[in-house]
From Swiss-Prot:
NCBIfam families: lgt. It comes from Gloeobacter violaceus (strain ATCC 29082 / PCC 7421). The keyword Membrane applies. InterPro entries: Lgt. It is a multi-pass membrane protein. This is Phosphatidylglycerol--prolipoprotein diacylglyceryl transferase. The keyword Disulfide bond does not apply. Its main location: membrane.
Amino acid sequence: MPMETGFTSPGPLIVQIGGFAVRWYSLLILAGIIAGTLLSQKLAPERKVAPEVLSDLVVWLVVGAIPMARLYYVLFEWQRFAGEPWWKVFAIWEGGIAIHGAILGGLLAGWLFCRRNGYSLLTMIDLAAPGLILGQAIGRWGNFFNSEAYGAPTNLPWKLFIPEANRPPGMAAFAYYHPTFLYESLWNLGVLALLLFVFFRFKNLRPGSIACLYALAYSVGRFWIEGLRLDSLMVGPLRTAQLVSLAGIVLGAVGLWWLNRRSARQEAP
């Protein structure tokens, strides 16, 4: 009998001692934050910003992003949390945050940081965008260990085994699913390569261009990948992430057009 191929999660826990547990999900979020911060610090001198400024900015971004990421998720999954103990709302270590909520919270915190310290918001989000997408690429692997954020059943060689307890209602007979976490992680690495190429190749771009390119490129991939998932956050019959991704595509494209048009006008004789 041929052996099955594909991914199988070893489980969400790295180690557990009594009631204390170290989870892959939390570790990968932390790793993503650290890697993203180091990358943005490395890029900062290219825009005449001191690397330590990025360290201060990241503290603000994390404080704004993580609570908003959880709040966003809980609001759209309220029927699930309404029947749980109240403390489950805050149990981020068990999984359940939304990147779009994190981006909204991070933007608000970044705006407050720049306003308070006199920095250009557009320059700062240009520096933060490559670090953010790197952090997303790393953090997505937390979904693998939690056996979540997967797609429709499949028999492809890179299929993902999902334990029966984590399968959707009515789909217990299907053991293997699309590893959408992997698709998004790889897409994010591609977006990172694009952002870094543009960042170093076109150094005279208007501030905000890298952030707009991030919004456009990430949203295109997220819209496609979200259509494969079975556990999307929903607004009625609509997938929330696809709606937000459409907005990201429009805002990113319009922002790039507006910045380039504005730049061309200023350079015209």
